[in-house]
Amino acid sequence: GTTWMQEITYLIYTEGDFEGSDKTPVHDRFNFIELNFEHPDPNVKVGLKRLEAETPPRLLKTHLSSNFFKKTLEKKKTKFIVVFRNPKDMLASYYNFYKMASFQFDSNGTWEEFFERFKNDKIVHGNYFDMQLSWWAYRNDPRVKIFKYEDMLKDPEQAVRQVAAFLEKDLSDDLIQKIVERTSFKSMKKNPMLNYSKFGGMDHKISPFMRKGQVGDWTNYFSKEQAKLVDEISAKKFETEGLYMEDGM
């Protein structure tokens, strides 16, 4: 859901810059701040180096917990849009990304091996439950807007309108509809500026970056025991904090 929300945010923030969306890959329009590598072009900065080189307002992307942004959150100048997804569907999606992205460690592993990594907090970015809870703690902060992937799928237009309201952008109904259409899964899947087909290090023959865009695909991967374990963790960590996630069942 990250790329989906990025494109929605970009088109709203720029008030319909479809030309920019058509010409510039989404990973160039948003600085992925935790990236840490030297770009082949010495004039191109990435991650924190790019962050330091640019001045606000900026569009940023991160998979980090809110713990990394406590000082920023305290200043109340930056807005955060956070997308949650059911942990079982997240794991199924991440497993396929894990396989197709050559820059991931041990990307040729089986689902069972990947699930063991998850159980032992050995996947990139660590414990998914703790990460979501770190942002859930800010659910009443007026500068933090939390979306659930499942709700976005149910009512894409409502999601677009909520992002527009959060960013204080008064857009026409016509532009809202155009953004909804442009950010549909069908449209994004075939858009080379969004589907990472031109991005190195990803083998789309193993798995496309944009696969299905639906709820419940986890049932094609999880054993009953694995599903039970994740449900138990969700109940213990999420539901005790008032966070409930749909799993398509």
Q: For each predicted feature, which ranges?
A:
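PAPS/PAP-binding and catalytic site of the sulfotransferase fold
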Residues: 3-15, 147-171, 179, 187
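PAPS-dependent sulfotransferase catalytic domain
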Residues: 2-147, 193-249
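Short, solvent-exposed coil/turn elements at secondary-structure transition points
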Residues: 65, 86, 150-152, 182-185
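Catalytic lobes of large eukaryotic enzymes
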Residues: 117-118, 165-208
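An amphipathic alpha-helix signature
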Residues: 88-91, 157-164, 173-176, 227, ...
